[in-house]
From Swiss-Prot:
Intrachain disulfide bonds: none
Organism (species): Aeromonas salmonicida (strain A449)
GO cellular component terms listed in the entry, alphabetical order: cytoplasm
Region annotation Involved in Mg(2+) ion dislocation from EF-Tu: where it falls in the sequence: 80-83
Protein name (Swiss-Prot/TrEMBL): Elongation factor Ts
Amino acid sequence: MANVTAALVKELRERTAAGMMDCKKALEEAAGDIELAIENMRKSGQAKAAKKAGRIAAEGVIFARTEGNVAVMIELNSETDFVAKDASFMAMGQKIADIAATQKIADVDALKAADFGNGESVELTITNLIAKIGENMNLRRVMLVEGDNLGTYVHGSRIGVITKLTGGTAELAKDLAMHVAANSPQFVKPEDVSAEVVAKEREIQIDIAINSGKPKDIAEKMVEGRMKKFTGEVSLTGQPFVKDPSMTVAELLKKEGADVVSFTRFEVGEGIEKQETDFAAEVAAQIAAAQKA
């Protein structure tokens, strides 16, 4: 067996960020050849990362980038908020957003296949960081919007918005992106609210009125007024502007000679069922697994 020195173990730890015992074992198996040890660890690290893929990555960060008339937003997930704040994770996420913007990539699979700039794909770069940190990660989605007046806003790394305007200023586009982040409208304008959503809300409001003791015909008349208020509340242009509630967004747009074409809002983990762990059961399972080993 080759003589594995403390200096070799230290160098391997620095180059791989793996644990001391893992590094010592890898060097012993590679007969002291550090390059072979790294190659073997990368192979086993990727296999180890693949095993983690079943774990739920419901934390993460929203990254945004504007490049000329292109705005891009991505969601990169991790299992814990701690890893989402890691410098390597943050740098990788911003680089992926930059790649999507400069290469105009609007598809997740295409973005995963893109060159990260280090001779490896985006997907492999993510996999390598999974192996290094020991926690599952996932490039969940990407949105690309093209237009002459685009606004992006990211709040606390967890909520991101892209707005697309005709007319107006870049500042207005960003202000409206901030508004969407804060107020979470579902539609651009009241007339965009789908018939299905309106019908469902009308039914709910009629039931509320009837249950309060109103006759059905009176209840139906009351609800018509409420429905107009409802469609305004769930649409961007019908809401009071977040920076000046004395005017609606529609009034602001008229004043600025602008219109909103679209908006996209991402929030970290939305739609992902987060796994709730019974800590006592998890510890018991780990002890049982250790006893079997």
